[in-house]
C-alpha cells in the first residue's frame, strides 16, 4: 500500500488531530472518535483507527509500519513504546519536531532534496534513525537556509521535547537522548496498534 497523498482534512475528521500530516485540526465537537454511524464501534475498528492514526501521522506505508512493529517486537522493553521511539527518532520526524518543517511530508522533502546534513554529511534518507549526540544542520547554501528560515518563521512556536535542542541562528539541531514516551507528539494508544498487528498473524 502506498503512502497517503489524498485530502488531509478528510483524515483528521475521521481520526482526530494528526499534527505530522497537517497543522489543521477538526472543529470542536466534531471529534469522529466519539461518533459512529452504526452506534458503538467494534474493538477491531478501534484498533484499526489507532493504527491508521500512527500511519498517517508519520507518513508511512503499511509495509513500513509493519516493519517497524516487527523490529519493536524483537527489542527489549514494551513493544508499543519501542515502536513510538523508532518512529519519533526518524530524521523526517526529528526535523518536524525541531520546527524546521511544518509537517512531516515537508520535512521528508527537505531530506530527499539534500538540504539536511547529519554530523556534517548529507543524509537523503528520511527514515534515517537519529541517535543521541547526532548534530542535524541545514546545508550551508543560501537556497537551503532561506527555505528552512521561511519554515521556521511560519511555524507556531512550541516547547521542544526534552530530547532535542535547537540553535536557530546556526540552523542546527542536537539530539540529546532517545525520546521519552511522555514527549511523543501524537495522542495515541500504542498498545492497540500492537494488538491490531498481533491479531493479523
UniProtKB/Swiss-Prot annotation:
It is found in: Plastid, Chloroplast. Residues 89-152 form the S4 RNA-binding domain. It comes from the Eukaryota. Keywords: Chloroplast, Plastid, Ribonucleoprotein, Ribosomal protein, RNA-binding, rRNA-binding. It holds the Pfam family S4. The keyword Metal-binding does not apply. Its main location: plastid. Residues 1-14 have a biased composition (Basic residues). GO terms for biological process: ribosomal small subunit biogenesis; translation. Belongs to the universal ribosomal protein uS4 family. Part of the 30S ribosomal subunit. Contacts protein S5. The interaction surface between S4 and S5 is involved in control of translational fidelity. One of the primary rRNA binding proteins, it binds directly to 16S rRNA where it nucleates assembly of the body of the 30S subunit. With S5 and S12 plays an important role in translational accuracy. HAMAP family: Ribosomal_uS4_B. PANTHER family: 30S 40S RIBOSOMAL PROTEIN, SMALL RIBOSOMAL SUBUNIT PROTEIN US4M. This is Small ribosomal subunit protein uS4c. It comes from Draba nemorosa. The lineage of its organism: Eukaryota, Viridiplantae, Streptophyta, Embryophyta, Tracheophyta.
Amino acid at each position: 500500500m502506498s503512502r497517503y497523498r489524498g485530502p488531509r482534512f478528510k483524515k483528521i475528521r475521521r481520526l482526530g488531530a494528526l499534527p505530522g500530516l497537517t497543522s489543521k485540526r477538526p472543529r470542536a465537537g466534531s471529534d469522529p472518535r466519539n461518533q459512529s454511524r452504526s452506534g458503538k464501534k467494534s474493538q477491531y475498528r478501534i484498533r484499526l483507527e489507532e493504527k491508521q492514526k500512527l500511519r498517517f501521522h508519520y507518513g508511512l506505508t503499511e509495509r513500513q509500519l509493519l516493519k517497524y512493529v516487527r523490529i519493536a517486537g524483537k527489542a527489549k522493553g514494551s513493544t508499543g513504546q519501542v515502536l513510538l521511539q523508532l518512529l519519533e527518532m526518524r530524521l523526517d520526524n526529528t526535523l518536524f519536531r525541531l520546527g524546521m518543517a511544518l509537517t512531516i511530508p515537508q520535512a521528508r522533502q527537505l531530506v530527499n532534496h539534500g538540504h539536511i546534513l547529519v554530523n556534517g554529511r548529507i543524509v537523503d534518507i528520511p527514515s534515517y534513525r537519529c541517535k543521541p549526540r547526532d548534530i542535524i544542520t541545514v546545508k550551508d547554501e543560501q537556497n537551503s537556509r532561506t527555505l528552512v528560515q521561511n519554515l521556521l518563521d511560519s511555524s507556531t512556536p512550541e516547547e521542544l521535547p526534552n530530547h532535542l535542542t535547537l540553535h536557530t541562528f546556526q540552523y542546527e539541531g542536537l539530539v540529546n537522548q532517545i525520546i521519552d514516551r511522555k514527549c511523543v507528539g501524537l495522542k495515541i494508544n500504542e498498545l492497540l496498534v500492537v494488538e491490531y498487528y498481533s491479531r493479523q498473524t
